[in-house]
């Protein structure tokens, strides 16, 4: 983490968090999401099955439990290291960084819901929850905030509404602008682009508008 303010770069960036890529920038850069939990899935599952088959209170069960814990600890270390390096690169390269305001804990609540409010699309939402947690959005945003503050960078969080549906060329906002998860195609002006890059550009624009409003 930078211990003192970094030299000015004159650059501003919007970042869109995702699961296909950890983040996509308004400059068109895609930062990989290593999916550490998924990558260790087979090893973890085998260790968990071995643990389940050991007799409670036995020495073998204790050792099996330690193996499961060690795998989880390795995944956490890998995820934290990647988040550190990614956040540091973003902070070093930009004076102004804009992201959407996300409540990751709320987004990853149990997909099954409650007795009074049962969940819908449980299997799909559970899969998305795992992907979000594996990507480490919360960890990354926390590190980004700390590093930005330490380096004297400005960090702005904006409302996510319509950032993925609005055309950066003409301003048209429509759900139909997203024919697929990865593609943006404006139904009004035919502007096309990668959907995540479009979202990041809209996030940056919203941040610059908020910055200007605060300065007025």
Enumerate the predicted regions with their spans:
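Positively charged, helix-rich recognition surfaces that bind polyanionic ligands
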Residues: 1-216
């Amino acid at each position: 983490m930078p211990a003192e303010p970094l030299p000015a770069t004159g650059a501003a960036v919007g970042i869109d968090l995702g699961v296909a890529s950890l983040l996509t920038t308004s400059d068109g850069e895609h930062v990989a999401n290593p999916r550490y939990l998924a990558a260790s899935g087979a090893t973890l599952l085998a260790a968990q099955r071995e643990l389940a088959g050991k007799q409670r209170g036995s020495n073998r069960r204790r050792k099996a439990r330690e193996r499961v814990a060690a795998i989880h600890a390795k995944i956490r270390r890998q995820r934290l290291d990647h988040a550190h390096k990614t956040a540091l690169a973003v902070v070093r390269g930009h004076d102004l960084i804009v992201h959407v305001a996300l409540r990751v804990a709320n987004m990853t609540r149990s997909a099954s819901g409650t007795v009074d409010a049962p969940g819908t699309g449980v299997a799909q939402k559970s899969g998305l929850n795992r992907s979000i947690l594996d990507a480490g959005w919360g960890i990354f945003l926390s590190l980004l905030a700390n590093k930005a503050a330490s380096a004297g960078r400005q960090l702005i969080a904006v409302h996510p509404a319509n950032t993925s549906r609005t055309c950066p060329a003409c301003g048209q906002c429509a759900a139909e602008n997203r024919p697929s998860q990865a593609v943006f195609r404006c139904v009004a002006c035919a502007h096309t682009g990668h959907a995540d890059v479009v979202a990041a550009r809209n996030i940056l624009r919203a941040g610059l508008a908020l910055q200007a409003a605060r300065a007025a």
